[in-house]
Structures are given as C-alpha cells and as structure tokens.
From Swiss-Prot:
It is found in: Cytoplasm. Catalyzes a reversible aldol reaction between acetaldehyde and D-glyceraldehyde 3-phosphate to generate 2-deoxy-D-ribose 5-phosphate. The keyword Repeat does not apply. GO terms for cellular component: cytoplasm. Keywords: Cytoplasm, Lyase, Schiff base. Pathway: Carbohydrate degradation; 2-deoxy-D-ribose 1-phosphate degradation; D-glyceraldehyde 3-phosphate and acetaldehyde from 2-deoxy-alpha-D-ribose 1-phosphate: step 2/2. The lineage of its organism: Archaea, Methanobacteriati, Thermoplasmatota, Thermoplasmata, Thermoplasmatales. It comes from Thermoplasma acidophilum (strain ATCC 25905 / DSM 1728 / JCM 9062 / NBRC 15155 / AMRC-C165). It is an enzyme of class 4 (lyase). Its EC number is 4.1.2.4. The active site is at residues 94, 158, 200. It comes from the Archaea. This is Deoxyribose-phosphate aldolase.
C-alpha cells in the first residue's frame, strides 16, 4: 500500500447522514471514529448538540462536523447564514452550493452567497467546506463553479454530498459521487488561482484503491488540514486495509 492505515484513517470524516439515524447511532458513529483514528464525524445538525456533549463528556479529540442546507442547497442565503450561526458549537460545517442559482447561471448570486457564508463561518471560528455536487454540473459549470468556490476562500472545496440523483447525473454523463478527474480539476484550478485550498472527496468511496487514486489526484499533503475523505463505510475500508497490510 502506498499509504498506511493511520494516514488514510486520519483523513476521514466518518459520516452518518441518513435521516433515520438515532442518538444511539450517532454515539456509535463517534465511538467508531475514535477507534479508527478518524479526524471528524460528519452529521446532520439535528444531532449536533448531542454529539458535542457526548464528545466533551468522553473527552475525545474527534472533531465535530455538521452539514448545512444538505443535501439540496436550496435555502435562501439568509437562512443558510442563520444555520451557520446556530452551529457555533461545532468545529466544522459542510454546506452545499446554492444549486438553483448555479444551474440558472446566476453567478452573481452564487458568488455573493458563497462570500457571505464563508464570512459567517469565519466569524464563528468554523472550518467551512463548500460542496459543489459536481455530478450535477456540466464541464463548463464545473470550471466556473470551482473558481467561484476557491475565490470565496473557504477552507475546503468538496466534491459531493453522496445523495445526488443518479439519473440526473447520468443524463449529464457524470458519476454521482467523487471522481479522481474532478478532484484533479479542483487541484489544477486552485493552482492556477494561487490557492492551496483543502480538498474533500466524498460520495461513492468504498475501497482503499479509490481513496489512493483520489489522494494522488488531489496533490495535497497527507494532512487533514488540506485533504479529507468523507465516507460512511469507513469500517469496511479499515478492515480491507488491515487485510492488505497482512
């Protein structure tokens, strides 16, 4: 293996985002993240304060990451800003781009929204990752949106939610989750713009080999401050890597 279990697991935001999860499921998610050495847990904000109290009580070093306007990116900017303000108990937020504006090519609205949400996050000392949901984008839209995101100066640009409509993605010739090609494009555009923005790949990541190809495409240090992998099936990859190691 090119990368060790410890290196890979430290990049992971261990995710539990299904709407039917319970407090017991969230507690289990946190315990799994701690045991596997993951950087963060990524959850819906309904369980944010529960998770914060659980982490504090256990004194775990796992970071708390909550999603905003997820998975659709359909709320007004004012609502998005308010939810970020209300999430100041967290360490990080992952927010979807305003997708309707993106698909309508209202780039003025997109740029203003992204500038506003990044500012609010920074005002509350939150790491912010902006999700492009690139399976919904044409090649021209990817090129334009990636530039908008990078210029807004969030901490990370992120590929996908993991909940994209596969039929719509397929109609554009796209996969519904993270791909090395899109990660590579993010990296190239960031370099062109003189940015060292972090990259987070998420959606449809199930194997070590997929992770390896994404890490190589990102051209980022093996450091959770610059590179993340979001996945719910972390345990399967953990077990797979232990077998490969043997």
């Amino acid at each position: 293996m090119k990368y060790s279990i410890e290196q890979v697991m430290r990049l992971v935001d261990h995710s539990g985002l299904k709407p039917y999860l319970t407090e017991k499921d969230i507690a289990r998610l946190i315990e799994e993240a701690k045991d596997m050495g993951n950087y963060a847990v990524c959850i819906e904000p309904i369980y944010g304060k529960f998770a914060k109290e659980y982490l504090d009580e256990k004194r775990y070093k796992v970071k708390l990451d909550v999603t905003i306007d997820f998975p659709f990116g359909s709320l007004a900017t004012s609502s998005r800003k308010k939810i970020i303000e209300d999430s100041d108990y967290a360490d990080e937020v992952d927010i979807v781009v305003p997708m309707g504006y993106v698909k309508s090519h209202r780039w003025d609205y997109v740029d203003q929204d992204l500038t506003d949400v990044v500012k609010i996050a920074k005002d509350h000392d939150l790491v912010i990752k902006i999700i492009t949901e690139d399976g919904y984008l044409t090649q021209d839209e990817k090129d334009r949106l990636y530039r908008s995101v990078i210029r807004a100066k969030p901490d990370f640009i992120k590929t996908s939610t993991g909940f994209a409509n596969k039929d719509y993605c397929a109609s554009l010739g796209n996969a519904a989750g993270a791909t090395p090609d899109n990660v590579s494009l993010m990296s190239r555009i960031a370099e062109e713009l003189g940015s060292d923005i972090g990259i987070k790949a998420a959606g449809g990541i199930h194997t070590y080999r997929e992770i390896e190809s994404i890490i190589d495409a990102a051209k980022r240090p093996i450091d959770p401050e610059k590179l993340r992998i979001g996945m719910s099936g972390t345990g399967k990859v953990f077990e797979e890597m232990k077998k490969i190691k043997k």
